[in-house]
Design a protein with these regions (language model features):
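Structural signature of FAD isoalloxazine-binding scaffolds in flavoprotein oxidoreductases
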Residues: 65-85, 137-159, 185-192, 379
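Short, acidic, Ser/Thr-enriched surface-loop or helix-capping motifs
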Residues: 89, 126, 156
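Substrate-recognition/cap regions that form aromatic- and gly/pro-loop-enriched pockets
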Residues: 301-428
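Glycine-rich N-terminal segment of FAD-binding domains in flavoprotein oxidoreductases
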Residues: 27-120, 134-139, 358
């Protein structure tokens, strides 16, 4: 370690003393050996090549289960590695260092009337973090982020730089994206861009029983639609507010090209406080607050909607509570069945479920850890839980039951959140995990890249591929 520290000093790389890192929930304190904040590629290469122990990779720290750290690791804090490296308006692509946030990309490309092809709903995330979990957004006709990635550059465990794309080193490409930092450090990415068009919001409420047919008729295949999601209202789980954004030439009602960084989200925060307080609060949100939020005509730029801030969800954590996410993916034909199980299990476990957002994603057949090997509806759950041991155990039991329900529907669950799934559930949801583990064994035989996710399902010293029975859905 002394040799590494000397090297880092010579490279001018900040090396912070041992400290405890956490994520936005405050539920996962992890004591790491060092936190390094690189600003240059060579600093990352040197740190990876010369550090003898485990290495973890962190960005915005919006994952919720220790996916960015493990005990005693050297954590690479990528947030200062944030430059635009190349841009082509003609090819509609941008190459960036992966510590850059989507907000910074939006600020760069907006002047050219361009927008990210795919990103998540909030712009605070780093590109590297988004790639590592293979995010999705609300974009109509799109799916996982990997669908907009032209190429990536990785630093492997031996310090070697490797370029990967769907055509070149494709196994690394499909393993590293959605690979939760298990194969190497994604240091650069070339991303596709789209037109920054004016979009008009549309909203209507319907029974859940009608939503899927309505989606097939009014959303699927409509090239003039840019964004869509459904809001499913607890506790009855029988009504959906369908929210769509359609290209338009109408006059703007919101002239700002990006959401102001200091925007107030008081109505949204009031909704969270209201719905988390009681069943009556959830009913008031459905009957009064959301009709207020979605009233009237709204015409804005695509980039304005893309630049929303995660502050909308604050406070995410307090002294004895946290607001937490889960996400499940089911084939479209199984939507109503899964929602029925969601309603039953939420009541059975007395979970304080605040919001369910329904998204659609096309198939991602290539990723080794694909959450959508087929077309899916994604259901994003936002709930409040206590931070006591008993409350954590109750949330874990609810989560495992929901995972079983998703698996029974031919679906999967998402990995960036609290690590409650059993090993058997993980393998059932991700049947290509043995391929990922075999690839990791080839490119990281010393098991250098670690975090709590991989410590749980791929513990050090395991006979990696052989210890993981392949169980298909």
């Amino acid at each position: 370690m002394r040799a590494l520290l000397l090297l880092l000093i010579l490279l001018g790389l900040p090396a912070l003393a041992a400290e405890t890192v956490n994520d936005v929930t405050g539920l996962n304190p992890i004591r790491v050996e060092r936190v390094l904040a690189p600003t240059e590629l060579q600093q990352i290469v040197a740190a990876v090549k010369n550090h003898p122990g485990p290495i973890s990779i962190g960005g915005g720290r919006f994952s919720m289960g220790g996916q960015t750290a493990t005990e005693g690791a050297l954590q690479l804090d990528m947030r200062d590695f944030d430059q635009v490296l190349a841009f082509s308006a003609e090819r509609r692509e941008i190459r960036v260092q992966t510590g850059i946030t989507w907000r910074e990309i939006l600020e760069y490309v907006d002047r050219y009337d361009l927008s990210p092809q795919i990103m998540q709903s909030y712009a605070n995330f780093t590109v590297g973090g988004s790639l590592s979990v293979n995010v999705h957004g609300r974009y109509v006709g799109e799916g996982a982020l990997i669908g907009s990635v032209r190429s990536i550059r990785l630093v492997l465990a031996d310090g070697v730089l490797v370029d990967a794309s769907p055509q070149h080193n494709s196994e690394l490409f499909h393993g590293a994206i959605g690979g939760y930092g298990g194969l190497g450090v994604i240091v650069e990415a070339t991303l596709g861009l789209a037109e920054n068009s004016r979009i008009a919001r549309e909203s209507q409420v319907m029974p859940l029983s009608q939503y899927r047919a309505w989606f097939d008729r009014e959303v699927r295949g409509h090239s003039d639609l840019v964004l869509h999601n459904g809001i499913l209202y607890p506790d009855r789980f029988d009504k959906v507010r369908a929210v769509s954004y359609r290209r338009t030439d109408a006059a703007l009602t919101e002239t700002a090209r990006l959401t102001p960084a200091d925007r107030s989200y008081h109505l949204q925060k009031a909704g969270i406080r209201l719905t988390s307080a009681s069943r009556t609060g959830r009913m008031l949100r459905e009957a009064a607050l959301d009709p207020l939020l979605f009233r009237g005509t709204q015409v804005q730029w695509r980039n304005h909607e893309a630049s929303l801030d995660v502050r909308e969800l604050e406070p995410i954590a307090g002294p004895d509570f946290s607001f937490v996410l889960q996400e499940y993916f089911v084939p479209p034909a199984q939507l109503e069945r899964f929602v029925g199980e969601l309603a039953r299990l939420t009541g059975q476990h007395q979970a304080n479920l605040i919001n369910v957002s329904i998204r659609h994603a096309k198939a991602d057949p290539g990723s080794l850890l694909a959450w959508a090997p087929q077309e899916v509806f994604a259901l994003v759950l936002y709930y409040r839980q206590g931070s006591s041991v008993a409350e954590r155990e109750r949330a874990a039991a609810w989560t495992r039951d929901l995972i079983d329900a998703a698996l029974a529907c031919g679906g999967r669950y998402y990995l960036p959140y609290q690590i409650h799934a059993s090993r058997e559930q993980f393998l059932a949801a991700y049947p290509r995990a043995p391929e990922f583990f075999a690839l990791k064994q080839r490119v990281d035989p010393a098991y250098k890249f670690r975090n709590r996710l991989w410590d749980t399902y791929l513990p050090p010293g395991a006979d990696w591929p052989l210890a993981m029975p392949h169980r298909s859905l």
